[in-house]
Curated annotation (Swiss-Prot):
The lineage of its organism: Eukaryota, Metazoa, Chordata, Craniata, Vertebrata. Mammary gland specific. Secreted in milk. Pfam families: Casein. Residues 77-96 have a biased composition (Low complexity). This is Alpha-S1-casein. The modification Phosphoserine is found at residues 90-91, 93-96. Belongs to the alpha-casein family. Important role in the capacity of milk to transport calcium phosphate. It comes from Mus musculus. Keywords: Milk protein, Phosphoprotein, Repeat, Secreted, Signal. The keyword Translocase does not apply.
Amino acid sequence: MKLLILTCLVAAAFAMPRLHSRNAVSSQTQQQHSSSEEIFKQPKYLNLNQEFVNNMNRQRALLTEQNDEIKVTMDAASEEQAMASAQEDSSISSSSEESEEAIPNITEQKNIANEDMLNQCTLEQLQRQFKYNQLLQKASLAKQASLFQQPSLVQQASLFQQPSLLQQASLFQQPSMAQQASLLQQLLLAQQPSLALQVSPAQQSSLVQQAFLAQQASLAQKHHPRLSQSYYPHMEQPYRMNAYSQVQMRHPMSVVDQALAQFSVQPFPQIFQYDAFPLWAYFPQDMQYLTPKAVLNTFKPIVSKDTEKTNVW
């Protein structure tokens, strides 16, 4: 074992100087190679620099070209924008002019429409007036024709009115005849009481009725106003109001109003003569008028004059 170790050591000792020499040789060779490579590498470096510079120049040229193109495009775009703005301005001005022209046209159209409406209304009014005038002319012609035909009608009416006038005259003349008949009957009854007793009760009642009718006719015709050919209903109400105001203000009534009041206030008609029965058998003919003031005065409370001075507890 010892021998083997020794041999290994000897071999290692012998091998050590050789490796050093080899390393020295290798370092020298490397230096030589590096120097030669440097000699050869110098033109390559220069070439690379030239290529880099050339590339840079190319890039600069490309950039300048791109800038020129961008400038050209910008100029074209600005020109296009200017043209578009000019066109827009021209279109706006033209549209404004058109709108300004259109606004008066619209107003003119409205005015024309209004004038047309007014003309239509005036035409309709004229047509209506023309129709109305035609109707008036027809009515006037009809009236004229009726006026030409009226004389015959007036004559007929006068013929019809003549008997009525005669009747009115006879009615105004009748009271005296009736009064004469009543006086004659009273004289006969007063002079011939025996004959009146011999007459039957039926005949007496008929005579009494005739006398009563004659008296009523005489009274009615005394107070009956004159008959007029025309009747005015609006004159009736003022007459009633005047009569009521006379009663309310306690003015003395005329004889005609008293007779009319007696005649209208009778609750039952008078059938028999005044001398046939005693006075208590007849109904009263005069009625007392009651005014609203007299009725209201009855309900006023009676109070002494010193009521204001007295204290109410």
